[in-house]
Amino acid sequence: MNDQSITVRGKDRYKSGVMEYKKMGYWEPSYQPKDTDVIALFRVTPQDGVDPVEACAAVAGESSTATWTVVWTDRLTAAEKYRAKCYRVEPVPGSPGSYFAYIAYDLDLFEPGSIANLTASIIGNVFGFKPLKALRLEDMRLPVAYVKTFQGPATGIVVERERLDKFGRPLLGATVKPKLGLSGRNYGRVVYEALKGGLDFTKDDENINSQPFMHWRERFLYCMEAVNKAQAATGEIKGTYLNVTAATMEDMYERAEFAKELGSTIIMIDLVIGYTAIQSMAKWARRNDMILHLHRAGHSTYTRQRAHGVSFRVIAKWMRLAGVDHIHAGTVVGKLEGDPNTTRGYYDICREDFNPMRLEHGVFFDQHWASLNKLMPVASGGIHAGQMHQLLDLLGEDVVLQFGGGTIGHPRGIAAGATANRVALEAMILARNEGRDYVHEGPEILAKAAQTCTPLREALEIWKDVTFNYESTDSPDFVPTVTPAA
């Protein structure tokens, strides 16, 4: 689209007044991105009557060096280098009026190792730009030179499995329910019953911090007492995600230190604390040999809508840089948003050393992760034992499966719910290891396991008809098609 540069050169470039962005050097269709460039892919929807190339050039300008008028101080900088360059504009398939804008940024525009600084440019003022109806950051290519300035996940999948001594299967967890209102003693009872019944982890929910019905210190004490008792009863290493999210960094450090003193192996934070706080807690976790779980609370306010916001695949990349060990990444079959192909893309970003471009998964760029640890994805929200074959097929084994209601809602009690999930998982892993087609035989495998496990039989009966089959609001723009044979 309009593959000729129209940049104004020489003294005319710096005449006072207003100049189109595409003439100021922010539209360079002949530009070849360098290996060290940060590349962003935006979905741009211009206002009616706005030239698409001008709109995309404006995104490049407003997310780097431009303002609304020519300023003479540009001549005091290496302006040609520091201007972001939109080098490619394409219509979005199936979305009339929207365009993909590929924009390259020189690496020197960004402070090393700072998500806050990166986002201040890439998703800063530009999202409020009036000539745009909508703007969405779809994907980013982060150069190795930039990736290496971040610590990455504090623990990583391999070391986490070694600490837990659990291999070859997904980890099992449950979020304590109800998420609000329990006393510390009753909260601890839920943790104990779930861990004793067969789960590896329990977790706080995103909004349980330190409220009048249960202060944080009380919760930590009862939870760790439950963990220690469950470990003694089962002979397995157990854990519970203690949410240290708080009003200030000082409060969060205090809570994390107390969790460490009590012997916890894992702490939890919420996405809403912000990028700087997340990176700060990740550095603390690495120094203190603690697994760091991130709940993506709040993400759907800007990731769910297809036309405007930030794709979760970008958030996943930022969080892998930032250094968390766990991140909620969708279930496909549960109650929360999650197109199968899009969700696979999220999981690939978390778990691969190198992400090749996979347009069918919404991944637009090759991404090298250098030596950064892998990030453990977490599946939670509306899943139950009857879906175990689907979960294993869709999400693989390096994942934490969180059955909250699917554990605590069991008619025979919490421990029975945990046992049902553990037996269902073990049966499916055994079938997979035997080479069986566990995806198609899944219901049969579960039914056979239920013959000798009353809790599983009851779980399959009570939740057999529960599905969440709604159309996804965020699916890939490119769908693979079969080429007919000649």
UniProtKB/Swiss-Prot annotation:
GO process annotations (BP): reductive pentose-phosphate cycle
Note on cofactor: Binds 1 Mg(2+) ion per subunit.
SUPFAM superfamilies associated with the record: RuBisCo, C-terminal domain, RuBisCO, large subunit, small (N-terminal) domain
Lineage: superkingdom: Bacteria
Cofactor: Mg(2+)
InterPro entries (alphabetical): RuBisCO, RuBisCo_large_chain_AS, RuBisCO_lsu_C, RuBisCO_lsu_C_sf, RuBisCO_lsu_fd_N, RuBisCO_lsu_N_sf, RuBisCO_lsuI
Binding site for Mg(2+): 203, 205-206
Presence of the UniProt keyword Endoplasmic reticulum in the record: no
EC code: 4.1.1.39
NCBIfam families: PRK04208.1 (NF003252)
HAMAP family: RuBisCO_L_type1
Family: Belongs to the RuBisCO large chain family. Type I subfamily.
Function: RuBisCO catalyzes two reactions: the carboxylation of D-ribulose 1,5-bisphosphate, the primary event in carbon dioxide fixation, as well as the oxidative fragmentation of the pentose substrate. Both reactions occur simultaneously and in competition at the same active site.
Designated name of the protein: Ribulose bisphosphate carboxylase large chain 3
